[in-house]
């Protein structure tokens, strides 16, 4: 995926092992370098393969350091699902 820098646009696609055809809510959640957790709108782009996308804008990638991302999905039957973590280092410009 190459380097991603603080304050840039970035598209993240995450894939889970769950069929998202009966999803009520999808998010990409993130543990940021300062240990806060944020939630971002997730767009389901492949229901059968469980792929969710978020296009980060420059204000969302507001910290350099190690981030951990995962899918959160709430299904129409009320069950909640948390996907496998994906780790990504976000760099300061010039690094």
Features from the language model and the residues they span:
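Contiguous segments within soluble domain cores/interaction surfaces
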Residues: 1-95
């Amino acid at each position: 995926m190459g380097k991603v820098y603080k304050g840039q646009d970035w598209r993240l696609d995450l894939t889970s092992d769950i069929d998202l055809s009966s999803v009520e809510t999808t998010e990409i959640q993130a543990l940021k370098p300062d240990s806060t957790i944020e939630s971002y709108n997730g767009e389901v782009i492949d229901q059968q393969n469980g792929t969710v996308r978020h296009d980060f804008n420059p204000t969302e990638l507001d910290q350099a350091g190690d981030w951990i991302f995962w899918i959160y999905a709430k299904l129409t039957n009320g069950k909640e699902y948390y996907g496998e973590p994906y780790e990504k280092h976000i760099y300061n410009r010039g690094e």
